[in-house]
């Protein structure tokens, strides 16, 4: 038993899609979240800069005495997860392998699509992980550089957003039976993405799949929070506007949250 919180980091608000799933599946666990919205999106940035920024977020979470860190950002997972996992003495999870595994299970025709930031797609990490598990599957990857900025701006269902999503995803329509949402921002656009891709395409939320792995590790290391540990005190931090973060966060999590601005 370990009553310390679980730490989450992301380039912005996208990681809240993972937090929402954790609140649903593991409602007794406490959360500390840091979103680097001031420097979002990470996708177009060079790998070394992503590495530097991600380590800053990790070190911030370590000051909060977290028992586990979840890199709730596909771009950061692709660039630096292995390094962070090797250097810390607490469990560190990324969101890519769970998403790849879930896509393999859900694919009926062996044609998997991956959408993500330019860096995630350029790294080719989803294709590599999928082919490690099943080399016979076809994988089509597509960079969607405009999606995360739309989510960060709060434009989740405007006509402009619908047009951007349609025009961006058009090359994949009719070509895949499963689609990995390879950025934790993208589930906030899920209804629009599903509408464009069609009802038969299975959308895979890599962040939500990650929560199953969180549960497994909590049990394996015996670090679940005690049921009688007292009231939860979730803490949310952002490097940008706390008001903007709270507005998106409360809409997505369907509860009031307190958000604090921090400088890194």
Swiss-Prot record:
Active site residues per record: 73 (proton donor/acceptor), 183 (proton donor/acceptor)
Residues binding substrate: 10-11, 42-43, 74-75, 184-185
Gene3D superfamilies linked: 3.40.50.1860
Pathway(s) where this gene product acts: Cell wall biogenesis; peptidoglycan biosynthesis
Top enzyme class: isomerase
UniProt keyword list: Cell shape, Cell wall biogenesis/degradation, Isomerase, Peptidoglycan synthesis
Pfam family of the protein (one): Asp_Glu_race
Catalytic activity: L-glutamate = D-glutamate
GO BP, sorted A to Z: cell wall organization; peptidoglycan biosynthetic process; regulation of cell shape
InterPro entries: Asp/Glu/hydantoin_racemase (IPR015942), Asp/Glu_race (IPR001920), Asp/Glu_racemase_AS_1 (IPR018187), Asp/Glu_racemase_AS_2 (IPR033134), Glu_race (IPR004391)
MF terms in GO: glutamate racemase activity
Assigned EC number: 5.1.1.3
PANTHER family assigned: GLUTAMATE RACEMASE
Similarity-based family: Belongs to the aspartate/glutamate racemases family.
NCBIfam families membership: glut_race, PRK00865.1-3
Function as written in the Swiss-Prot or TrEMBL entry: Provides the (R)-glutamate required for cell wall biosynthesis.
The protein, known as: Glutamate racemase
């Amino acid at each position: 038993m370990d009553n310390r919180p679980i730490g989450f980091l992301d380039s912005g608000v996208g990681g809240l899609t993972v937090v929402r799933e954790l609140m649903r599946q593991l409602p007794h666990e406490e959360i500390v979240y840091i979103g680097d919205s001031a420097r979002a999106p990470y996708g177009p940035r060079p790998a070394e800069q992503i590495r530097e920024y991600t380590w800053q977020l990790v070190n911030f979470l370590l000051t909060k005495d977290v028992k586990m860190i979840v890199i709730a950002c596909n771009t950061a997972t692709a660039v630096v997860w292995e390094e962070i996992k090797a250097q810390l003495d607490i469990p560190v999870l990324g969101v890519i392998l769970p998403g790849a595994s879930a896509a393999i299970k859900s694919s009926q025709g062996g044609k998997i699509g991956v959408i993500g930031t330019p860096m995630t797609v350029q790294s080719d990490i989803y294709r590599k992980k999928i082919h490690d598990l099943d080399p016979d599957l076809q994988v089509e990857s597509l960079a969607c550089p405009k999606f995360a900025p739309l989510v960060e701006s709060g434009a989740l269902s405007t006509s402009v957003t619908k047009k951007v999503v349609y025009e961006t995803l058009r090359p994949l329509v009719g070509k895949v039976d499963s689609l990995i949402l390879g950025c934790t921002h993208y589930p906030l656009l899920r209804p629009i993405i599903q509408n464009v891709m069609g009802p038969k395409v299975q959308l895979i939320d890599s962040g939500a799949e990650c929560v199953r792995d969180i549960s497994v590790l909590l049990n394996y290391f015996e670090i679940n929070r005690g049921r009688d540990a007292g009231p939860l005190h979730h803490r949310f931090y952002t490097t940008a506007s706390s008001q903007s973060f709270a507005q998106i966060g409360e809409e997505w999590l369907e509860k009031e949250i307190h958000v604090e601005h921090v400088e890194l």
